[in-house]
Curated annotation (Swiss-Prot):
EC number(s) per entry: 2.3.1.225
One Pfam family per UniProt: DHHC
Name of the protein: Palmitoyltransferase SWF1
Keywords: Acyltransferase, Endoplasmic reticulum, Lipoprotein, Membrane, Palmitate, Transferase, Transmembrane, Transmembrane helix
Task of the protein: Palmitoyltransferase that targets several endosomal SNAREs. Palmitoylates the SNAREs SNC1, SNC2, SYN8 and TLG1, at cysteine residues close to the cytoplasmic end of their transmembrane domain. May have a role in the cellular quality control of transmembrane domain-containing proteins.
UniProt gene name: SWF1
Catalytic activity line of the entry: L-cysteinyl-[protein] + hexadecanoyl-CoA = S-hexadecanoyl-L-cysteinyl-[protein] + CoA
Compartments, record wording: Endoplasmic reticulum membrane
Domain DHHC, chain residue ranges per copy: 134-184
Coiled-coil stretches: none
Length: 336
């Protein structure tokens, strides 16, 4: 099979993935949606072996880079490397991503069953994103603050960040350290390889094989990808939130920008509400006949509230994040 044919098939597959949800009632997209898209990309519980494909893909890429170096590159640049570099530094750089990747895969984040109510590790409810006495509809256990149910792992993960497809594991309380070390080790190994190969290529007096250029480009690309992803992860930590909470905060701030987020000044009501203005159909004067209803920011509370004393939030600084310790280091220490 030629590379051109393989490329065409790959593009066709991507097009089917993108269009099948839109044209799921039209053949041939309907067949693809029913037999491929739905069971493989939507249903978490069907064909669970698919969850190992991305970690296998990552492992294959990494092993290909190592193979290319040892079998096609090392012999051509051997004289350009220091002895200590060949026998110690290179092996040390190659091994950590593999070892830490395995460690991140097998390290289990804590869940609600590990949580003891009233313990010193318990996070308080902020009555904005999290409310007490809310039971997970699947686990049937009261959800601690900052927890989230993972449909793939089928459990409520404490301080849940996200389910990482690269290691097929939930990132949460108990394995943040392993996850961050895995990311940093990938950046360091790829960056070192890229810079060293680039330096050798620029200063070499002889023509180097194409494999050196290929490995240099691949390591450079993976350095950028890993660095961007790691930066985005750590930027969230700086703000005192998780990936899961970032989505919640975005929703809260969208309501604020629309002038629909209010804080109650009544002692007998939860603090935060969404304001919904409804126009009466038979109103003669629209501005004077608007009906205002308030809904709690608690997604599990569907009651209508009538507030008499409240203020409309106009700036993000008026919304406290009680989980933000103030500095990046303090937030990172709290997670790990």
């Amino acid at each position: 099979m030629s590379w051109n044919l393989l490329f065409v098939l790959l593009i066709g597959f991507v097009v089917l993935i993108l269009l099948s949800p839109v044209f799921k009632s039209t053949w041939p997209f309907s067949t693809f949606y029913r037999n491929v898209f739905q069971p493989f990309l939507v249903d978490d519980q069907k064909y669970r072996w698919k969850l190992h494909l991305v970690p296998l893909f990552y492992t294959s890429i990494y092993l290909y880079l190592v193979y290319t170096y040892h079998m096609r590159v090392e012999s051509t640049i051997k004289n350009e490397l220091f002895l200590l570099e060949r026998i110690l530094i290179v092996p040390i750089i190659i091994l950590p991503p593999v070892a830490l990747g395995i460690l991140a895969m097998v390290s289990r984040a804590e869940d609600s069953k590990d949580h003891k109510s009233g313990s010193t590790e318990e996070y308080p409810y902020d009555y904005l994103l999290y409310y007490p006495a809310i039971k997970c509809s699947t686990c049937r256990i009261v959800k601690p603050a900052r927890s989230k149910h993972c449909s793939i792992c089928n459990r409520c993960v404490l301080v849940a960040d996200h389910h990482c497809i690269w290691i097929n594991n939930c990132i949460g309380k108990g394995n943040y350290l392993q996850f961050y070390l895995f990311l940093i080790s990938n950046i360091f190994s790829m960056c070192y390889a890229f810079l060293r190969l680039w330096y050798i290529s620029l200063n070499s007096t002889s023509t180097l094989p194409r494999a050196v250029l290929t490995l240099t480009i691949l390591c450079g690309c993976f350095t950028i990808i890993c660095a961007i992803f790691t930066y985005l992860q750590l930027a969230i930590v700086k703000e005192g939130m998780t990936t899961n909470e970032q989505d919640k905060w975005y929703t809260i701030q969208e309501y604020m920008r629309e002038g629909k987020l209010v804080r109650s000044l009544d002692d007998d009501c939860p603090s935060w509400f969404f304001k919904c203005t409804e126009q009466k159909d038979d109103a003669a004067e629209p501005l004077q006949d608007q009906h205002v209803t308030f809904y709690s920011t608690n997604a599990y509370d569907h009651k209508h509230y009538n507030l008499t004393h409240y203020i409309t939030i106009k700036d993000a600084s008026e919304i406290p994040n009680i989980y933000d310790k103030g500095t990046f280091l303090a937030n990172l220490t709290d997670l790990i």
